[in-house]
Amino acid sequence: MAKRDIDFLFEIGSLRNMPRAWQQILSGKVQNISEHIFRTTMIAWIIAVAEKADINKVIKISLIHDIAESRAGDIAFLHREYVTRHEKLAEKHIFKDTILEKEASVLLEEYDERQTLEARIVKDADNLEVDLELKELAKIGDSSAVGMQKEHRPEVREKKLYTKTGKRMWDSIQKTDPNAWHQSLTNRWVKNRKGAK
C-alpha cells in the first residue's frame, strides 16, 4: 500500500456527489459520475467478451476513464466553448503517490490515444451508457432526451462507435423498452401476482 491510497479511495467516493453535466438541460434525475462509471464498466465488460479483448485491461480503463471529473468536473457540449479543463493534470494529481500511479498513467494515456481495441471498447461503452440513460429519461417523458436521441445520437452510432458489438448494442438499445427487463420476470412473486401458483 502507498501513502495516499486511502485518500484516493475517499476522493473517488466523492464522485457520487458529482452530477453529470447535462443535468442543466435534462429534466429527469440524471446519474452522478459514480453511477455512470459503474454502468460504463459493465457495458465495456460485455463488449470486451464479445470482441475477445483483454477484459482485465478494459475493466481497469473503464473504472478510471472519467476519474479526472472528481477535480475537473463534467462538462457538456454547451460548456466546451467556454471552459478549459485540465484533465491530464487532475489525473496526475489524483493518482500521485498511490500504488496505482504508474499503471493508471499508462492506461489513461492508452485510453486518450484510442489506438488499442481495449481503449476503443471503453469509449464505445462510454457512449452507449449515454444512450441507455437518454432512453430511460425519454421513457419518463423528458422531451430534451427525446430530442437528443433523435437528432444527435444516430450520428454517434455512425461516426463515434468503433466496434461491431458497440454498433449492435446501439441498435438494440433503440429498440428496447427500459422497463422490459422486469416486466417479463417469471419469479414466484410475479406469478402469484398474476394469479398463478
Language model region names:
Residues 1-197:
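Alpha-helical, largely C-terminal catalytic domains
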